[in-house]
Amino acid sequence: IPNIFNQNEISAEIKKNLLNELNLEFNFEKKLHYKFFPRPHFITNELSIIFNDNKISEIKKIKIYVSLNNLFSLKKMKVKDIIIENGNFNLNKNNYNFFIKLLDSNFKDIKFEILNSNIFYRNLQNEVLFVNNIINANYIYDLNESKNILYSKNKIFNLPYSIELFTDKEKKILNSKINLESLRLQIENQFLDGEEFNSGLSRFNFLNLKSIAEYKSNKNYFEFKLFDEAQNSKFSYNGKLNFRPFHSYLYGSANELNFSHLFSNNAIIKQLLKTEILNNTNVDFELNITANKIKNFDNFTNIFLNSKIQEGLIDLD
């Protein structure tokens, strides 16, 4: 049984397996313990992951399941499944693509799972911009589609959502499907990583109302156009999110504004207020919308809506 082997040899062989199969460099700070039930695996506490020569995570616990047939030979032992629990991942603009790059790993014979963990998105001054809670994330290989897929349940700003992520290597496109059930919003996205700037196309389904967004971004900004999918477009919006300094705006026009979608019992505004996302002092947002009329309010015409959110305060004209 593996207990007869030298601890350093076990650690080195498992690290080698993880690096070869997943291109992940692990640093084990404590001893690896072998468990036979419910199936053969190693377990340890206090470890980290090295990415681009920098430590990006601190992990409380990991389980590494290994092949049973080769347990008596370290050289033939193969890692089968990995479960990370209670990990903290620190990402910034230099390593933001860590979870995306994992999709290039070999998941044909290995399943990779992350439970009850957090992603801290930081600026280069190491200040936390926001935190994404990972409830359950799974990297698997889909035999029918012949591709790696990430399925993940998360929460951000107290807003639960799920995401499905996969890549098209030939077209160099990252595909994602996001479901925000509490907002009744689904988003399908295609993202192309270009040399000068990134671009993409998103399709939104909100309360069975379908719309399309085209966008592009670089290290300084994120810019988009949003319009409905109908042949005769009823609305069109332009927006931009500047990162230096952090500021965003949304300008647009619509034939008719329907406030029932915004303020009903299950509306998006009410759900956003519950999450307290608008209280975040990092949110700096400006809104300017024009419309011909308001639905069910015929006396209101030629509408101009102006709003600003800054340092947790909402100003509405």
Walk through the language-model features, giving the residues of each:
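A short, sequence-level motif marking secondary-structure junctions
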Residues: 33, 62-65, 127, 166-171, ...
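Strand-loop-strand
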Residues: 195-198, 202-241, 316-317
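Flexible beta-edge/linker motif
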Residues: 3-7, 11, 32-124, 140, ...
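Short extracytoplasmic/periplasmic juxtamembrane "stem" segments immediately C-terminal to an N-terminal membrane anchor
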Residues: 9-31
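Elongated, acidic membrane-bridging lipid-handling scaffolds
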Residues: 87-196, 201-208, 266-315
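Short, surface-exposed beta-strand-loop junctions and turns on beta-sheet-rich folds
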Residues: 50, 127, 229-230
